């Protein structure tokens, strides 16, 4: 049985603009897509973050939804997959832990943002070929959280 492990860490900033700025503001628009394993989407009109996952059977499921994703702030996001459980961290808090997850196995292309999407920024995105420790997640967050943008 094929298994793989990975982690992705990055920072996302969403500017505050009115929903009529462009059509992307009225729909879920991709901010950071790790080959749909998962995809971070934001809807400005609803002020809602949704994290979607495409599974091995090519179905999509919602891993996490919140209307507490801070606009006009840098938000640290981490996807940590150990081969059996997918954990999602936002600003050093575990917000979702989904056991038995088998992401869709495909060549993965990571994309940041969407053409004519939501205004903001993405920085300090790192891919790890193994799951990372809780201590490393905390360090990735605390080491640059006071910087604007949060880069070394």
Identify the residue ranges that each predicted region occupies.
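Extracellular glycan-associated modules
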Residues: 1-152
């Amino acid at each position: 049985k094929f298994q793989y492990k990975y982690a992705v860490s990055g920072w996302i900033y969403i500017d505050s603009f009115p929903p009529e700025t462009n059509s992307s503001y009225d729909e879920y628009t991709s901010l950071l897509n790790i080959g749909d394993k998962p995809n971070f989407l934001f809807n400005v009109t609803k002020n809602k973050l949704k994290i979607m996952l495409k599974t091995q059977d090519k179905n999509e499921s919602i891993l996490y939804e919140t209307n507490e994703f801070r606009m006009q702030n840098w938000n640290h996001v981490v996807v940590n997959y150990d081969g059996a459980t997918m954990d999602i961290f936002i600003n050093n808090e575990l917000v979702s832990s989904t056991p038995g997850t088998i992401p869709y196995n495909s060549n993965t292309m990571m994309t940041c943002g969407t053409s004519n999407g939501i205004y903001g920024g993405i920085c300090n995105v790192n891919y790890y070929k193994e799951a990372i420790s809780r201590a490393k997640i905390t360090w990735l967050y605390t080491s640059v959280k006071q910087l604007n943008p949060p880069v070394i």
